[in-house]
């Protein structure tokens, strides 16, 4: 029979404070730090909103990482906390211990609460407390510095989530006192007018990652360009399935010129992804030459580019240190691949991922990229499936990978000799050819993970048709 340990003095003190909310409110400002986090966690768990409102006003740390405690925003809890912040911001005589500068609604700092395991199971030693205070008690900003509220935002629907809508209204009513900082903003289906309303409230210089899906390029450029220019700390920029409704090449050129000027101010950009690249066909150089910071990741996918577009990729220093290059499903079969080969030679020392899946590259074009590819000594991932390769071309390609010792994942198409009149694999022919290709590869290096022939995606397993099967050859 186990004997339950008696409540600790710390636990009893906290329970007493929470039983009488009026008492806890009057005591908050003098509450020892050793009680603050466990008491806040218990008040949060029990949804003692009045207690939470007051605790926020006397919060003894510079940051309140609420997002890691509240995985999903709860409207009443959010209202209670924001009410406390409002009272804190509007007080003429701020509490003498006031340190709070940041309310973080992102799920980013579980360690903050993990240092205080459980609501009451708190082990506190003087040396650890002093270290904790040193970490938290950074030099305070001036009294008039805006309070920062951090949140990652995903706009999916109208009407907006009620918590997000309430937060937007609360921040808007306190312009100048509060900065709504959004390190990651994703917009899926929200109409552009609602996205603009959100951007007027968000502190634009805080946005580090921006994703925009399913918009018209002309409207996006005309309506959002002025906001993009203010995102000075942007490091990741994604445009996915943005379409264009004009066939006027001259108009497209003018729009691309306007859009490209945005990149002159993006000095921290490291990733640029454009899915459905056709809008920039014939105008890509206007964008590339405006890039100010060397990119690590460039993804231009789905659609077609002209030879002049591919040529410009090797001519600007901003693309000279790429680690990841993705041109999947950009149709390249009608152009010379010498410019792509020149780019591979330029970035050979840094390139780690190369995706040329579904580009419909013909074996007659292959020789243009082999010298550059063979020098990519840091390459770990190479996708080359869904291209038109003969058996001889595939053998040549595999031999040129002999020096790529870091390759850990690679995909290749079935040779055209194994395809029937419907461009489907004849497995009776394909199976021995695949074995022959593996023998060719093992003569020059030992592969780690390789897929030859029609396969699902090695990362997610999805396939484009029922006929596709996974064939892990090694």
From Swiss-Prot:
InterPro entries: LRR_dom_sf, PRAME, PRAME_domain. One of its GO terms (molecular function) is ubiquitin-like ligase-substrate adaptor activity. LRR repeats lie at residues 97-124, 179-203, 204-230, 231-265, 266-291, 292-323, 324-342, 348-375, 376-400. GO terms for cellular component: Cul2-RING ubiquitin ligase complex; cytoplasm. Keywords: Leucine-rich repeat, Repeat. GO terms for biological process: negative regulation of apoptotic process; negative regulation of cell differentiation; negative regulation of DNA-templated transcription; positive regulation of cell population proliferation; proteasome-mediated ubiquitin-dependent protein catabolic process. The keyword Membrane does not apply. Belongs to the PRAME family. PANTHER family: PRAME FAMILY MEMBER 1-RELATED (PTHR14224:SF81), SIMILAR TO PREFERENTIALLY EXPRESSED ANTIGEN IN MELANOMA-LIKE 3 (PTHR14224). This is PRAME family member 13. It comes from Homo sapiens (Human). The lineage of its organism: Eukaryota, Metazoa, Chordata, Craniata, Vertebrata. The gene is PRAMEF13.
């Amino acid at each position: 029979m186990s004997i339950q340990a008696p409540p600790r003095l710390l636990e009893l003190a906290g329970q007493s404070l929470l039983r009488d909310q009026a008492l806890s409110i009057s005591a908050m400002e003098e509450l020892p730090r050793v009680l603050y986090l466990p008491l806040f966690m218990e008040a949060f768990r029990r949804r003692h909103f009045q207690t939470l409102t007051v605790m926020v006003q006397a919060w003894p740390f510079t940051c309140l990482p609420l997002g890691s405690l509240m995985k999903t925003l709860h409207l009443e809890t959010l209202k209670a906390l924001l009410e406390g912040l409002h009272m804190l911001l509007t007080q003429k005589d701020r509490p003498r211990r006031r340190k709070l500068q940041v309310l973080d609604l992102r799920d980013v700092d579980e360690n903050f609460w993990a240092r205080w395991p459980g609501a009451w199971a708190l082990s506190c030693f003087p040396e650890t407390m002093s270290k904790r205070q040193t970490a938290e008690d950074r030099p305070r900003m001036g009294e008039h510095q805006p309070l920062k509220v951090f949140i990652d935002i995903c706009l999916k629907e109208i009407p907006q989530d009620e918590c997000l809508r309430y937060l937007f209204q609360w921040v808007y009513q306190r312009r100048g006192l509060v900065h709504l900082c959004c390190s990651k903003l994703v917009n899926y289906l929200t109409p552009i007018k609602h996205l603009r309303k959100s951007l007027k409230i968000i502190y634009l210089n805080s946005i580090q990652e921006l994703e925009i899906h399913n918009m018209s390029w002309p409207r996006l450029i005309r309506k959002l360009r002025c906001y993009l220019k203010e995102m000075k700390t942007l490091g990741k920029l994604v445009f996915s399935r943005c379409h264009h409704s004009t066939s006027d090449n001259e108009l497209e050129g003018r729009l691309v010129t306007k859009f490209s000027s945005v990149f002159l101010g993006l000095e921290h950009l490291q990733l640029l992804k454009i899915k459905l690249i056709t809008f920039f066909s014939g105008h890509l150089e206007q964008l590339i030459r405006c890039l100010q910071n060397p990119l690590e990741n460039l993804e231009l996918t789905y659609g077609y580019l002209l030879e002049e577009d591919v040529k410009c990729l090797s001519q600007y220093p901003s693309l000279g240190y790429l680690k990841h290059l993705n041109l999947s499903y950009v149709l390249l079969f009608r152009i010379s691949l010498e410019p792509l080969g020149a780019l591979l030679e330029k970035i050979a020392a840094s390139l780690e991922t190369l995706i040329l899946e579904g580009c419909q590259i013909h074996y007659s074009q292959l020789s243009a990229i082999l010298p550059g590819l063979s020098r990519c000594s840091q390459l770990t991932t190479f996708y080359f499936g869904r291209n038109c390769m003969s058996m001889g071309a595939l053998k040549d390609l595999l031999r040129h990978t002999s020096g790529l010792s870091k390759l850990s994942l690679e995909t290749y198409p079935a040779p055209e000799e194994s395809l029937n009149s419907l461009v489907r694999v004849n497995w009776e022919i394909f199976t021995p050819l695949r074995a022959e290709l593996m023998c060719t590869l093992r003569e020059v290096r030992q592969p780690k993970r390789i897929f030859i022939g029609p396969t699902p995606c090695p990362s997610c397993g999805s396939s484009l048709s029922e006929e596709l099967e996974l064939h892990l050859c090694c």
